[in-house]
């Protein structure tokens, strides 16, 4: 996280930006769940805060990541849960139509619903949730693994080369496009190891047009070496808000 913050600061000096989103593993750390943290980064944790405080070991990691800590406050203020750039929505696992419907009673338009999602997660990270409604939606956004924008696997499991009008795409992707008036969805979360190990891919195509959904978790981490030892570096390039291109490095 520190690295990406540094990259954003450097990019900003040249008219660019590096936008970072929150994912389920950042939230797990804030919940005190370190199941997927390596032994080294848990037991030998070592962090010097900008204010001069030193945090070490497992207890140090717990204190650094607890809601309301200085580190998590920075995380809350520098990262969103969902981001729309142009006509493309970016989020970790995907905002499902069923989640949008659960926000209907708030009487918010589609953009305000996304702002509300960002606000509730941010308030939780800042340790500033207040009232029953905040707690209710915090549980929905963060803990409900079936529909949470950090946890659901719906978008990640749709097969390649699936039409936008198929049941799988229509009931999740197309309805989300309609509700939020967007053109494309980009998600991570579910490693794309089932697509002939091709990594980043798109699906939910519309006749005469490109794919409406892109999945960009190619299983690039070393933890997936057992499944794909020859994985390559990939990026999804988006130009002029309409041209999507998957760039893949040459295999060794």
Curated annotation (Swiss-Prot):
The chain crosses the membrane at residues 80-100. It is a single-pass membrane protein. Keywords: Host membrane, Membrane, Transmembrane, Transmembrane helix, Virion. One of its GO terms (cellular component) is host cell membrane. This is Uncharacterized protein R398. The lineage of its organism: Viruses, Varidnaviria, Bamfordvirae, Nucleocytoviricota, Megaviricetes. It is found in: Host membrane; Virion. InterPro entries: Metallo-depent_PP-like. Its main location: host cell. It comes from the Viruses.
